[in-house]
Amino acid sequence: MNRIRNFSIIAHIDHGKSTLSDRLIQVSGIVAARDFRDQILDSMDLERERGITIKSQTICLPYKAKDGAVYSLNLIDTPGHVDFSYEVSRAIASCEGALILIDASQGVEAQTVANLYLAVDHDLEIIPVINKIDLISADVERVMEQIEEDLGLDSSAAVKVSAKEGVGIEDLMETIVAKLPPPKGNLEAPLQALIFDSTYDDFRGTVIHVRVFEGKVKPGDMIMFMSNDSVYKVEEVGIFQIVRKPRKVLAAGEVGYIIAGIKSLSDTRCGDTITLKTNRCAAAMPGFREAKPVVFSSIFPIGSDEYEDLATAIDKLKLNDASLVYEKTSSLALGFGFRCGFLGLLHLEIVQERLEREYDQSLIITAPTVRYEVVYHDGTSMFIDNPELFPDPTLIQTTREPFIKASIIIPDKYMGAVMTLCMERRGISTTYHYLTGSRMEMVFELPLAEVMYDFYDKLKTVTQGYGSFDYEMLDYRDSRLVKLDILVNGERVDALSQLAHEDKAVERARHACKMLSEEIPRQMFKIPIQGAIGGKIISRETISALRKDVTAKCYGGDISRKRKLLEKQKKGKKRMKTIGKVAIPQSAFLAVLKSDQT
């Protein structure tokens, strides 16, 4: 056990986490040079293209140190995005140490700080690593100052590397062996293992990724999940070295996998504790909670005959993504589909892209919404995440919406622009303070619904790319919410209904009406497009009618002849308007829903 080191790499997005993992893998020599490729731990095409890590990956690296001993370095590669922060916290709980990776040209950013606090909470030994020292724009001295002042770490212990060029990787390996503590644990104690991730194998069922804290587990053992008391028989245990390597036993201090013929990912919850059925451990590992969806949206197939294909695709995707929540729904305008819950907007985008790419689906996705709380006059309350379920306003005493605490790190010259942006989004400024030099951290309390759409992009725009942002959930607060309906030719289109704050409703309604008026083709009669709150119309656009020139055949002569023909046309148009139906094309739905997300 003294020769094991468990660590994770935590960093802000784009600071070179996956590239550093690649170099550590190359130095350990477990992958032949001809089999090696960049971002080797990122198994999805989507991860490679976007340059982000979506799913945690684990790998056991054998390393022969300068003292002649061979060490097992267990690297747990974590996602960097705030949507997956619970996964990151479970991965960190599985380690004794962490490498805090900082880009030499960007410096300390918001998620670096957030993840550092997470590591400190779990009493991890921390090694600061300055990456990208080969860049012309690298300012190592400035970053070392930030490590001292912003993070409160000893900058003299920082290891300087260039993951891309492979500079300083040997030094980093030696530092990991020397600085990080070996795991503690008793081989004879009852089994206590933490689940920090799981994947689905078509042939073997669920593969559980675990860190064993106490005792040992081997094939044939009867294991039990402490959150739901379900029992399974272990078929195989082993470690990860890019591919799964079976072992006879997985013992205290080790990181590996367990296969036990589990058919569904929903049985294996991230953060749960595994023990033996016959010899239970005294307590579960602390910190377990259900992953709760934050953003909700409905997904419909473009053709109603493709519903069964979409159902199969979502079921398969759920096998590899336990945090995706969904139920069946239907819409008068779009037919049958699914109401889905996601961890955040990035999670929604990833699910959409995977359904379109891997399962060849053409989708319509409704405007994302958060979960609101409605309090009735009799004191009872309910949570709603679908505009269709919003009750009659006369029954409601108050509505409440979720707020977040947003931490924004920027150069101070952008303070005014960021303050304006946050105030426009109904933000409340709580504190701000200087970090190093001209860099400052601003803390705001913001409604989650206002951050959901394009806040991050707008922040990058007003700070010319220098702003970084991280958030955590706070609580629910009273808010003036209304249900905004869109009417086309007097008929409500349920798929375009949305919940909005009173102050933003008119702006949203105008925008939706304008987009629809540009996309719906003209008919032989006028089409009014209206935004309404209850019975009150708050915005309107009109698509003018196509007209046939009925007076073309009248050459000269009496004006009353022309008037008679025009009156006849007007009557026909009136009758057409009462019985005419407007078919809304798919492009119109897509235009409105896309514009809601931008």
UniProtKB/Swiss-Prot annotation:
One of its GO terms (biological process) is positive regulation of translation. Residues 2-184 form the tr-type G domain. Belongs to the TRAFAC class translation factor GTPase superfamily. Classic translation factor GTPase family. LepA subfamily. It holds the Pfam family LepA_C. One of its GO terms (molecular function) is translation elongation factor activity. SUPFAM superfamilies: EF-G C-terminal domain-like, P-loop containing nucleoside triphosphate hydrolases, Translation proteins. The lineage of its organism: Bacteria, Pseudomonadati, Thermodesulfobacteriota, Desulfobacteria, Desulfobacterales. It is a peripheral membrane protein. Keywords: Cell inner membrane, Cell membrane, GTP-binding, Hydrolase, Membrane, Nucleotide-binding, Protein biosynthesis. The gene is lepA. It is found in: Cell inner membrane. It catalyses: GTP + H2O = GDP + phosphate + H(+). This is Elongation factor 4. Its main location: membrane. The keyword Cell inner membrane applies. GTP binds at D14, H15, G16, K17, S18, T19, N131, K132, I133, D134. One of its GO terms (cellular component) is plasma membrane. Coiled coil: none annotated. Required for accurate and efficient protein synthesis under certain stress conditions. May act as a fidelity factor of the translation reaction, by catalyzing a one-codon backward translocation of tRNAs on improperly translocated ribosomes. Back-translocation proceeds from a post-translocation (POST) complex to a pre-translocation (PRE) complex, thus giving elongation factor G a second chance to translocate the tRNAs correctly. Binds to ribosomes in a GTP-dependent manner. Its EC number is 3.6.5.n1. NCBIfam families: lepA, small_GTP.
